[in-house]
C-alpha cells in the first residue's frame, strides 16, 4: 500500500482537536466550527488550543492560498515530495452569516436583486420572508458561491501550472445545500432537493471519461469510491457502509446501482426517533417519528412535482408502504439504525434509545 501525505485544511466540524484524534492527517490547518468568514481562526499542527491563528482574510481565499502553498511545497516545508498526497480543502462558505462576503463578489451582481435571481415557484416573497431573511439574503449567498468557485479555480490552475493535473484526481462536492426560502425553509436539515441534492464532480484527465450520471450516490460512498479509484479497493474495510462506485466513474460495467438513497435526521440524544426516508429516482419519502405522536408521512413525486410543493402521502399509502418495505427497511438494517416506522408511546420508559 503506498504511503500518502494526508493534509486537511479549512472547516472541520469540531473545536480544537487533539493530535491523537486527527484521523491520521499529518498536516493540520483546521477552521473549526466558528463562522467568522472574514476573520477566521485556525489551529495548525502545533497551535495550542487557547491561542489559535487569527487571519484577516476571507476564509476561502486564505484556504486557497494555503492549498497552493502546499502544492508548491517550497523548501519541502509541507510534505514529502517523493510520496503522493491526498489534500482535503474544506471551505465553510457558502454558509451563514451570508453578509460576511467581500464586496467584490457582491459587486458582480450589482445590477440584480435577490428576488430577480431567485425565481423558484416554491419561494413566496411575502412579508415573513423579507423580514426573516433580509433583502440581500439570496444575493449574498450567490456571491459566496461565486467567490468559492473562483478560489477553487485558483487551486486547479496551480495544479496545471505545476504539471500535476494529469496525475491528480480532483473531487468537488458539498455536505449539503440551502433552501434559501424554498418551501418556507431557510437552510438545511430538511428533505427538500435544494438541501439534499448537492454537486458531486470528479476530474482525472485521461482516467475518467467525460460524462453525466444519475447514479444515486451518497456521502458514505465517497471513501470507498476514492480507495477504488486509487487502486486500493481490496483494502476497503468490511465495516464501511458505503459502496465503491469506481467502475462506474471509470466507464466500466460491474457496479450494482442503488435504487434509492437513505435520508436520516436524528435529534441530539435521540437515535431512535426523528426523521428517516429514502430518495428514489422518482420519489422522496420521509417519515417523522415523535414521542407520543402519530407518525407523519411526506411523499413527493419529483417527476410531476419537481419543486416538491405537494405532499401526496395520504392518498398513496400503498406506495408509501412499498417504499418502506423495499427501500427504507433495508437501509435501516444495513446501517444498523434502530429507528423503525412505529409510534413511540408518550410514557415510554426511555424514548431516547
Listing of model-derived features with the role each one plays in the protein:
Residues 32-61, 68-220, 228-239, 287-294, ...:
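Active-site-proximal cap/lid insertion segments
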Residues 2-3, 93-95, 268-269:
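Short histidine/acidic/glycine/proline-rich micro-motifs that form metal-
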Residues 323-328, 332:
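Short amphipathic alpha-helical coiled-coil/interface segments
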Residues 2-3, 53, 242:
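Catalytic-site signature of metal-activated, phosphate-bearing donor transferases
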Residues 313:
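Segments surrounding the PLD/"HKD" phosphodiesterase catalytic module and close analogs
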Amino acid at each position: 500500500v503506498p504511503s500518502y501525505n494526508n493534509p486537511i485544511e479549512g472547516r472541520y466540524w469540531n473545536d480544537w482537536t487533539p493530535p491523537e484524534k486527527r484521523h491520521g492527517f499529518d498536516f493540520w490547518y483546521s477552521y473549526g466550527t466558528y463562522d467568522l468568514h472574514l476573520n477566521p481562526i485556525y489551529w495548525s499542527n502545533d497551535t495550542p488550543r487557547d491561542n489559535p491563528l487569527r487571519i484577516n482574510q476571507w476564509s476561502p481565499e486564505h484556504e486557497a492560498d494555503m492549498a497552493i502553498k502546499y502544492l508548491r511545497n517550497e523548501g519541502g516545508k509541507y510534505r514529502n515530495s517523493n510520496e503522493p498526497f491526498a489534500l482535503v480543502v474544506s471551505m465553510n462558505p457558502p454558509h451563514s452569516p451570508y453578509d460576511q462576503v467581500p464586496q467584490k463578489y457582491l459587486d458582480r451582481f450589482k445590477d440584480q436583486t435577490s428576488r430577480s435571481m431567485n425565481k423558484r415557484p416554491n419561494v413566496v416573497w411575502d412579508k415573513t420572508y423579507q423580514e426573516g431573511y433580509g433583502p440581500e439574503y439570496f444575493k449574498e449567498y450567490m456571491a459566496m458561491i461565486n467567490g468559492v468557485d473562483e478560489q477553487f479555480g485558483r487551486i486547479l490552475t496551480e495544479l496545471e501550472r505545476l504539471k500535476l493535473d494529469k496525475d491528480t484526481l480532483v473531487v468537488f462536492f458539498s455536505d449539503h445545500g440551502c433552501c434559501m426560502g424554498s418551501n418556507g425553509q431557510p437552510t438545511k436539515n430538511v428533505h427538500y432537493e435544494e438541501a439534499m441534492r448537492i454537486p458531486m464532480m470528479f476530474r482525472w484527465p485521461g482516467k475518467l471519461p467525460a460524462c453525466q450520471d444519475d447514479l444515486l450516490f451518497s456521502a458514505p460512498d465517497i471513501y470507498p469510491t476514492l480507495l477504488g479509484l486509487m487502486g486500493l479497493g481490496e483494502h476497503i474495510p468490511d465495516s464501511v457502509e458505503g459502496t465503491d462506485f469506481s467502475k462506474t466513474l471509470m466507464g466500466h460495467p460491474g457496479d450494482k446501482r442503488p435504487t434509492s438513497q437513505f435520508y436520516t435526521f436524528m435529534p441530539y440524544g435521540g437515535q431512535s426517533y426523528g426523521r428517516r426516508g429514502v430518495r428514489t429516482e422518482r420519489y422522496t419519502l420521509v417519515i417523522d417519528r415523535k414521542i407520543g405522536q402519530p407518525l407523519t408521512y411526506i411523499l413527493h413525486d419529483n417527476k410531476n412535482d419537481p419543486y416538491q410543493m405537494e405532499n401526496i402521502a395520504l392518498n398513496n399509502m400503498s406506495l408509501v408502504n412499498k417504499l418502506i418495505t423495499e427501500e427504507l427497511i433495508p437501509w435501516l438494517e444495513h446501517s444498523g439504525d434502530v429507528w423503525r416506522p412505529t409510534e413511540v408511546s408518550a410514557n415510554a420508559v426511555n424514548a431516547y434509545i
